């Protein structure tokens, strides 16, 4: 990236994994600095995806990274699966929630037939909050059958929440169409 040449007045610290220093050790040292931005060149392996999520959660004001997912849902799925494969999480929904919390925007670039890169779309990630909408009316029910009906209502809500794994929604806020950028969801 040659950031020292582009930003000569900035205090830039570069780290790279070696045979004797792991990427996790680099991240642990970086967390102790007062850095503002983390740039992770290529999130192509499961451990690097895990480091990126960690860095975005606690190590800086924001984190930039590259990835080759074709769609936003593919990006979330790939990062979630990396978190599961590295053993950071064992629950699919929890892993996805953590990924979604750090993905604010996806700036998706493509290359045209001439080899020129351009931004195809900018997508915003909106985490969905889990609503606690259980019905506590069973306490007021007079009969056993009425209490049982309320119990089954709450059980239905619980199992719907457990099986509906939607943790986010996403919207394209800018798209490239016919040579122009168009605001689609300002």
Task: Report each predicted region and the residues it spans.
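Intrinsically disordered, low-complexity boundary segments flanking structured domains
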Residues: 2-5, 92-96, 105-110, 151-163, ...
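A generic structural micro-environment signature
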Residues: 9, 21, 49, 105, ...
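Helical/strand "switch-coupling" subdomains that flank nucleotide/phosphate-binding cores, especially
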Residues: 51-54, 83, 96-121, 125-127
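Generic alpha-helix signal with a bias toward terminal, lower-confidence helices
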Residues: 13-15, 55, 79, 111, ...
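C-terminal lobe/lid and adjacent interdomain/linker elements of RecA-like ASCE P-loop ATPase modules
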Residues: 3-19, 114-131
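Switch/coupling sub-region of P-loop NTPases
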Residues: 1-100
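NTP-binding/hydrolysis catalytic cores, primarily Walker-type P-loop NTPases
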Residues: 118-186
């Amino acid at each position: 990236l040659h950031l020292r040449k582009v930003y000569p007045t900035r205090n830039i610290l570069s780290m790279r994994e070696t045979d004797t220093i792991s990427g996790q050790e680099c991240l642990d040292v970086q967390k102790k600095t007062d850095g503002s931005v983390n740039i992770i060149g290529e999130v192509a392996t499961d451990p690097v995806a895990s480091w990126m999520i960690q860095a975005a959660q606690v190590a800086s004001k924001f984190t930039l990274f590259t990835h080759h997912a074709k769609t936003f849902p593919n990006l979330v799925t790939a990062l979630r699966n990396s978190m599961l494969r590295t053993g950071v999480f064992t629950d699919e929904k929890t892993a996805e929630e953590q990924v979604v919390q750090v993905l604010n925007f996806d700036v998706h670039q493509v290359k045209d037939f001439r080899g020129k890169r351009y931004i195809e779309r900018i997508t915003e990630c909106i985490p969905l909050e889990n609503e606690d909408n259980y019905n506590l009316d069973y306490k007021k029910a007079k009969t056993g059958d009425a209490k049982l009906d309320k119990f089954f209502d709450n059980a239905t809500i619980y199992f719907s929440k457990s099986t509906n794994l939607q943790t986010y929604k996403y919207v394209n806020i800018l798209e490239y169409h016919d040579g122009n950028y168009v605001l689609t969801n300002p």
